[in-house]
């Protein structure tokens, strides 16, 4: 197995949440986005009486996690599926003590997957977390959607203020040839952007919008939220790490809508990475952690 590139985000804060939990034999920790097992590995090392359910739709990443967590064999159950599908079939009689959903993309996908998540790669513009399931790829969308549909997609799923300029450039390029690689798309978007100072790559929001659409990320989050809280045990905790305002708003509004008698929001404001974490892990800079506790059934 290649080196694990992904550094788990807000790990210390998540461990602190577990410290405050009443951990006893049979404690169940569900990692909804197992990735390469960073969070789960730390949890399993620290707590000998915790069992982990690890979920990931990407079978390649799941196999990497199995290798990295091999020392914990017998304490981890693996499920190769979307987290919303897993919880739609989860038996309510088997309650969960702690659910973690880190909604970020694994560094493996950016660095090693070959699926077009990274700006500067000359690889197929795909962006599907599980290509085997079929469905539209980013290549299909960027080369076939009409002007209005592309404008709406990019603006609504990222808030990109220059979506019209970007789409105009995309359509002009399509007259010459298809857009095949992330590098091509990044170049098109960057040239369409006005010459202003940015802290991020000009193509960041366009890539975000495509990835969200391709993997139906917002639908899966909205579907999962009620399933997650329903699956929690008394005093069970749900911790969600988001990476953009669309996800964060969905989680915030859902938490606010829950019964204050039955649930307690543990984060009036989201927990953000400390300056030190941002320095050694730049991928954490936009992370926000929101946490809720179930008081009783």
From Swiss-Prot:
Lineage top rank: taxon: Bacteria
Write out the annotated subcellular location.
Cytoplasm
The GO terms this record gives for MF are: rRNA (cytosine-N4-)-methyltransferase activity
**Which reaction is this enzyme known to catalyze?**
cytidine(1402) in 16S rRNA + S-adenosyl-L-methionine = N(4)-methylcytidine(1402) in 16S rRNA + S-adenosyl-L-homocysteine + H(+)
InterPro entries per UniProt: RsmH (IPR002903), SAM-dep_MeTrfase_MraW_recog (IPR023397), SAM-dependent_MTases_sf (IPR029063)
One cellular component term from this protein's GO annotations in UniProt: cytoplasm
Keyword S-adenosyl-L-methionine (UniProt): yes
UniProt KW keywords: Cytoplasm, Methyltransferase, rRNA processing, S-adenosyl-L-methionine, Transferase
Class of enzymatic activity (EC top level): transferase
Specify which residues bind S-adenosyl-L-methionine according to the UniProt entry for this protein: 37-39, 56, 87, 102, 109
Main subcellular location: cytoplasm
Name the Enzyme Commission number(s) assigned to this protein: 2.1.1.199
Q: Name one GO biological process term.
A: rRNA base methylation
Q: Which NCBIfam families match?
A: 16S rRNA (cytosine(1402)-N(4))-methyltransferase RsmH (TIGR00006)
Family the entry assigns: Belongs to the methyltransferase superfamily. RsmH family.
Its biological purpose: Specifically methylates the N4 position of cytidine in position 1402 (C1402) of 16S rRNA.
This chain's protein is named Ribosomal RNA small subunit methyltransferase H
Q: Which organism is it from?
A: Borrelia turicatae (strain 91E135)
Q: What is the lineage of its organism?
A: Bacteria, Pseudomonadati, Spirochaetota, Spirochaetia, Spirochaetales
């Amino acid at each position: 197995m290649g080196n694990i590139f992904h550094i788990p985000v807000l790990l210390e804060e998540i461990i602190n949440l577990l410290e405050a939990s009443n951990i006893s034999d049979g404690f169940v920790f569900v990692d909804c986005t197992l990735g390469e097992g960073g969070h789960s590995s730390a949890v399993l090392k620290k707590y000998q009486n915790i069992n982990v359910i690890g979920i990931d739709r990407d079978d390649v990443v799941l196999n990497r996690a199995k290798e990295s967590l091999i020392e914990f064999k017998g304490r981890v159950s693996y499920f190769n599926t979307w987290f919303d599908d897993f919880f739609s079939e989860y038996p309510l009689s088997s309650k969960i003590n702690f659910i973690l959903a880190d909604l970020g993309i694994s560094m493996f996908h950016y660095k090693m997957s070959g699926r077009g998540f990274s700006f500067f790669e000359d690889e197929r513009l795909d962006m599907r977390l599980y290509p085997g399931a079929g469905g539209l790829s980013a290549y299909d969308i960027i080369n076939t959607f009409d002007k209005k549909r592309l404008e709406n997609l990019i603006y609504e799923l990222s808030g990109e203020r220059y979506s019209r300029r970007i789409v105009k450039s995309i359509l002009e390029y399509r007259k010459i040839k298809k857009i095949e690689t992330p590098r091509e798309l990044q170049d098109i978007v960057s040239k369409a952007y006005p010459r202003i100072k940015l802290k991020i790559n000009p193509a960041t929001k366009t890539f975000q919008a495509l990835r969200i659409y391709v993997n139906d990320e917002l639908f899966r989050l909205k579907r999962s939220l009620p399933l997650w809280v329903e699956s929690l045990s008394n005093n069970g905790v749900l911790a969600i790490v988001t990476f953009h305002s669309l996800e964060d708003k969905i989680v915030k509004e859902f938490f606010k809508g829950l019964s204050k008698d039955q649930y307690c929001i543990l984060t009036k404001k989201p927990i953000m990475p400390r300056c030190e974490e941002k320095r050694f892990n730049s991928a954490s800079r936009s992370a926000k952690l929101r946490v809720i506790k179930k008081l009783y059934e």
